[in-house]
């Protein structure tokens, strides 16, 4: 095939028909469909993908843009490169060529190492730029790869925009950075236009937030270092380094976010907390909780992203099976008593509570919450926030809510004796109380209440049940494979319980869909313990933790590790992941 030839829709359709991937009818449909002004700018593969055709060689699979890109890569004999933005070194990639050269030729550097540079394009036969680039990059070799048109059109302008924003901020003078820039940022709410450097910071902050939403991050970490700061995202419970930027640029980014969160920009010596509202790329309103911390190299900022889909997520999506769902719903239908959800920070406790309250919050009941902070605004709850500045704690909040004629009270966390006692008083006076504790498993919550100073007979009289939970990463459905089981690890996980050992289980591999991690998304595993008469008697008699666990086992209550083992058998997660997350004692 001849170089310097730009593929068009006609060429693609003829080749697809020749290869038996589309029918004559499909070709005619695409050729005779009118394109509007915007669609005329599309790449041929994007226009063909628009019709959602079936791949005639694999009738069960649609001809989406990725599949069409794979076909074109095979056709022209080039590898298809899928950009993983989490692993891209934007500074290095954009230094390969100027933005003008990249935009003019519709190419992008996607990987750089000492011997060669990978250059991505969506027009594999247009190569009149190669000789010029080889000359400027010698002695490094150039290797051509094919990019999906969607990826090229997104990351080509985005990479250069981010790089330009960082460099513009880096080149500002010390006076501009420390004074003029911050003053201009403070005026962003007015009608005045900030200078160029500050506008770059605004764009950089927007890119960080939108990128975090797209990647499904739960937390954003902005971490200062001596020379270069780091931007990290927590995705599926694991931190990924996204970007390195000069320390002064990161400082300006943090200042911008502090202003948006209404924090004191000048105060960098003590921790601060705040919130900001923004919108996701899908247009959903979401909130971020901000927390700053003074460190040796400057102020560190962590943003916790509250998932706007939390309140519309079903229990099945959270990981509840049919039996657990019935038990949990029966427990939450009680008119009074205490229900606890336990687990470490980030284990999904708040999501479970919100989902439960959403079902309970009908027009016939008054649902009140006291939280620190309010994690998700919901119109069917009456939500109240703890405020240490005015001495409004959880215990004070519960005391105030008791005078508001509540039916159901949600206490964000029982962390001291006063809060525990107020929750018990609320339960004794005819209210249903839902709250959280930080314990490793369900039986431990009983001894934890005792440690907080709650009288055992009061715990026995008011506690209805406990749900302990963890979040495990789900295996990527696109690449998981069966492999032989590690018998020793399986026996370690299921000790003292009779669960048949399978010969093979699914494990992680890694592909473009899961960023080579082998996992995509997370799901809950649960240990549910309802307090029957025997357990209540043990609690009243101040039984130790081993006695409580023994009685729970007699009742058929299965620990978290067994719930994890069942998820392994279902092919949902891996043995290594469950062993990483659950307590084995």
From Swiss-Prot:
Knockout mutant characteristics: Disruption of the gene reduces transformation rates by two orders of magnitude. Natural transformation is undetectable in the pilB-tfpB double mutant. The tfpB-pilT mutant makes very few T4P. The pilB-tfpB-pilT triple mutant produces no detectable T4P fibers.
Keywords of the record, alphabetical order, are:
ATP-binding, Cytoplasm, Metal-binding, Nucleotide-binding, Zinc
| Residues annotated as binding Zn(2+) | 476, 479, 511, 514
Q: Which GO terms describe its cellular component?
A: cytoplasm; plasma membrane
The reply on keyword Phosphoprotein is no
Database matches in Pfam families:
MshEN, T2SSE
Where does this one sit in the cell?
Cytoplasm
| Keyword hit for Nucleotide-binding | yes
Q: Which GO terms describe its molecular function?
A: ATP binding; ATP hydrolysis activity; metal ion binding
Annotated residues that bind ATP are located at 346-351
Q: In the UniProt entry for this protein, what further remark is given in the free-text comments? A: Both PilB and TfpB are essential for optimal T4P production, with each motor playing a distinct role in T4P extension. Overexpression of tfpB does not restore the transformation defect of a pilB mutant.
**Biological role stated in the UniProt entry:** ATPase component of the type IV pilus (T4P). Acts as a molecular motor to provide the energy that is required for biogenesis of the pilus and the extrusion of substrates generated in the cytoplasm. TfpB is required for optimal T4P extension and, consequently, efficient natural transformation. May play a role in initiating T4P extension.
Family of the protein in this entry: Belongs to the GSP E family.
UniProt protein name: Type IV pilus assembly ATPase TfpB
Q: Which gene encodes it?
A: tfpB
């Amino acid at each position: 095939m001849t170089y310097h030839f730009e593929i068009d829709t006609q060429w693609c359709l003829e080749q697809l028909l020749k290869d038996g991937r589309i029918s004559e009818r499909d070709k005619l449909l695409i050729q005779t469909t009118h394109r509007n002004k915007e669609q005329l700018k599309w790449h041929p593969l994007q226009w063909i993908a628009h019709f959602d055709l079936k791949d005639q060689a694999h009738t069960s699979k649609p001809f989406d843009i990725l599949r069409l890109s794979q076909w074109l890569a095979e056709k022209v004999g080039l590898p298809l490169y899928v950009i993983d933005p989490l692993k891209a070194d934007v500074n290095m990639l954009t230094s390969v060529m100027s933005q003008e050269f990249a935009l003019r030729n519709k190419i992008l550097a996607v990987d750089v190492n000492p011997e060669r540079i990978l250059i991505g394009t969506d027009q594999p036969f247009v190569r009149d730029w190669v000789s010029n680039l080889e000359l400027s990059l010698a002695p490094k070799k150039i290797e051509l790869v094919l990019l999906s048109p969607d990826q090229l059109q997104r990351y080509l302008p985005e990479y250069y925009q981010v790089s330009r924003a960082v460099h513009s901020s880096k080149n500002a003078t010390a006076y501009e950075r420390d004074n003029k820039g911050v003053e201009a940022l403070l005026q962003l709410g007015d009608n005045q236009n900030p200078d160029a450097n500050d506008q770059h910071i605004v764009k950089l902050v927007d890119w960080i937030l939108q990128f975090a939403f797209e990647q499904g991050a739960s937390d954003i970490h902005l971490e200062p270092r001596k020379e270069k700061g780091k931007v990290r995202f927590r995705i599926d419970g694991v931190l990924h380094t996204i970007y390195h930027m000069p320390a002064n640029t990161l400082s300006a980014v943090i200042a911008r976010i502090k202003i948006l969160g209404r924090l004191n920009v000048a105060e960098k010596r003590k921790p601060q907390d705040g919130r900001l509202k923004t919108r996701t790329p899908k247009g959903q309103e979401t909130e971020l909780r901000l927390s700053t911390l003074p460190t040796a190299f400057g102020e560190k900022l962590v943003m916790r992203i509250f998932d706007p889909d939390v309140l519309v997520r079903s229990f099945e999506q959270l990981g509840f099976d049919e039996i657990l769902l019935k038990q949990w719903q029966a427990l939450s239908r009680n008119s009074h008593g205490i229900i606890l959800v336990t687990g470490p920070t980030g284990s999904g406790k708040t999501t479970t509570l919100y989902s439960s309250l959403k079902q309970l919050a009908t027009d016939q009941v008054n649902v009140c919450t006291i939280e620190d902070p309010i994690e998700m605004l919901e119109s069917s709850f009456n939500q109240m926030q703890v405020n240490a500045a005015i001495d409004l704690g959880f215990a004070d909040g519960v005391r105030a809510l008791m005078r508001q004629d509540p039916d159901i009270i949600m206490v964000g966390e029982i962390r001291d004796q006063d809060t525990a006692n107020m929750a018990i008083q609320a339960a004794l006076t005819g209210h249903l109380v839902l709250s959280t504790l930080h314990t490793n498993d369900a039986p431990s919550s009983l001894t934890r209440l005792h440690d907080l100073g709650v009288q055992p007979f009061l715990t026995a009289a008011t506690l209805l049940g406990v749900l302990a939970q963890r979040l495990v990463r789900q295996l990527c459905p696109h690449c998981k494979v069966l492999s032989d089981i590690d018998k020793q690890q399986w026996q370690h996980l299921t000790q003292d319980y009779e669960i048949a050992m399978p010969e093979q289980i699914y494990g992680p591999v890694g592909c473009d869909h899961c960023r080579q991690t082998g996992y995509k998304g997370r799901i809950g595993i649960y240990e549910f313990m309802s307090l029957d008469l025997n357990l209540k008697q043990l609690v009243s008699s101040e039984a130790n933790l081993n006695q409580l666990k023994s009685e729970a086992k007699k009742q058929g209550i299965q620990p978290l590790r067994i719930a994890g083992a069942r998820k392994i058998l279902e092919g949902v997660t891996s043995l290594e992941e469950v062993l990483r997350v659950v307590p084995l004692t």
